[in-house]
Structures are given as structure tokens and as C-alpha cells.
Amino acid sequence: MMKNVADWIDNVLHNNAVPTDIVAFCFNLYEESDSSWAMELVGTERFDLEDEDWACNEATDFGSRENLYNWKMECEWDEALAYLVNELKQYLSSGKYAELLKSKEGVGVGFVDGNIEILHSK
């Protein structure tokens, strides 16, 4: 397991090319079990600030579905989301692949069955 979110993102994007048809990125979150959470990164062929279903137009998961970022945290789902929002905002400000992520139309994060929080849009 990667020691932190930044290392995990670096590993995913270092080992997987971004297809040319990708217009946005979404970090999908899952509640695995009590106090156990997971995240994957997908690239989408669509982005729309007015329609959260853009994240359903997945073109690739960059292999992250087989290599999820997992963490343990005793909290409610909204606290897990807030933790990841903070981590991802830090990454987008100074991470190794921050400019690559921000070069597309948008970057979002959210639970697969919930709302998406937009972290960056052009």
C-alpha cells in the first residue's frame, strides 16, 4: 500500500499513459467496510459542471481499480470525503502530476453513489 495519497497518484499516473480522449479526471471513493475506505482514479470523455453524470463517461481507470488507495479512518462518509478533498487540493497545488491533472477540463472527487465535488475546472 502506498504511504500517502500523493505517492499513490504519482504511481498511478507514472505507470499509465493518459489517453488523448480524456477530458477530465474523477477520484471515485468507496466505503469498503466499517472504518475502511478506498479510492480509484478514472479518466472521462466528458465534463460538465451542470451534470454530475459526466463522471459516468469513464474511458479508463488507469489500472487503479486493481490498485486502489485504501485507508482506515473511523468516521462518517462526509468526513472521509473532507479528508480526501484536503489531500487532493494539496496535490493539485504542488503534486508531481498536478499540471497534468489541471490541463484537462476538470478534476472531481466523490463517492460513486453520491455528488461530485469539483476541485478544478477550466
Model-derived features: where do they sit?
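Aromatic/basic-lined ligand-recognition segments
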Residues: 40-42, 55-59
